[in-house]
C-alpha cells in the first residue's frame, strides 16, 4: 500500500471517528455535566500528547508559549460552546453548525486581516449562511425573518464555530513559525487548565461513572484528540489539500448517519436542505475557493482539532 493511499484511509478514519463522537458525547451527557466532561477528556488528551512529544518540550521558546496560549484559548472556547450546546441540540445539527467554522475563516480574514475573498469563496459563504438560516430558524409563515424559537443549543454551537474559526486562523499562523508538536501539546494543556478552572464557576459538576461516560472520555481524548493530532501531522504530508478538504467535509455527514442509525434522528425537509447548503458551501469554498488563490500567511491549519471536532 502506498503512503498516499494509507494517508487517505487514515484521514477518512479520523473523520469518521469525529463524526461518530457527536452521538457518543450526546449519549454520555446524560450522566455527566458538559464542562466536567470537557475537562476530563482534555486533561487525558494533554497528558497523552505531552508523553508522546516529551522530547520536543524542553526547547519551547517564549514565542511558542504565547502562540500555544492564544490557540489554546480559542480551542477551550470552541469545546465549551460545542459540548454545552450539544446538551440542547441534536448531534446532526451540532456537526453541521460546527462545520461553519471553515466558512467563517475567510470571512474573519477579510475583516481582520484584509484578505480578499474570491467569488467562489463568497458564493460558498452565501450558501452556508442560507443553510444556517434554514437549519436553525424555525419556519414562521407570518414573518420571513422571525428569529423567535431558535434553539439555545444551536446558538451555543454557533459560538463554537466562531471560536474554532479563530483557532484555525491562529493555529495556521503558529504552524509556520513553531514546531507542531510543541503547539499541539501547549494548546491542549492551556485548554485543559481553562476547562478545569471553569467547571466550579459555570456549573454544578455531576457525574455517574457509567460505561458510556468512560467510553466517551477515552474515545474523545485518545482517538479523536491525541491520536488524531499525530495521524493528521503525518497523513497530510502525502495528501493534496483539496483531498483533505473533501475528506473533512464528510464529518457532519458521518455524524448525521450515526445519529440516524443510533438515535433515529431525522432532520426534516427544511433542516435537511439547510444542512445540504452548509455542506455545499463548505465544499465550494474549500475546493474551488482555495484552488483559485495562492497560499497565504495563515499557513496550514494542521494539526488541528477539527470542525470540528468534538
Where are these regions (language model features)?
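Specific transmembrane alpha-helical segments of multi-pass solute transporters/efflux pumps
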Residues: 17, 21-22, 50-98, 134, ...
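Hydrophobic transmembrane alpha-helices of multi-pass small-molecule transport proteins
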Residues: 49, 69, 117-139, 161, ...
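Hydrophobic/small/kink-forming positions within alpha-helical transmembrane segments
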Residues: 16-19, 23, 50, 72, ...
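Membrane-interface helix termini and inter-helical loops of multi-pass transporters
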Residues: 23-31, 84-87, 136-150, 199-217, ...
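Hydrophobic alpha-helical transmembrane segments of multi-pass integral membrane proteins
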Residues: 6-10, 36-51, 121-134, 151-159, ...
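Helix-helix packing/entry segments at the starts of transmembrane helices
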Residues: 38-40, 94-101, 170-193, 221-261
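C-terminal transmembrane-helix exit sites in multi-pass transporters
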Residues: 48-58, 101-126, 253-273
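Glycine-/small-residue-enriched transmembrane alpha-helix faces in small-molecule transporters
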Residues: 1-36, 73, 81, 143-173, ...
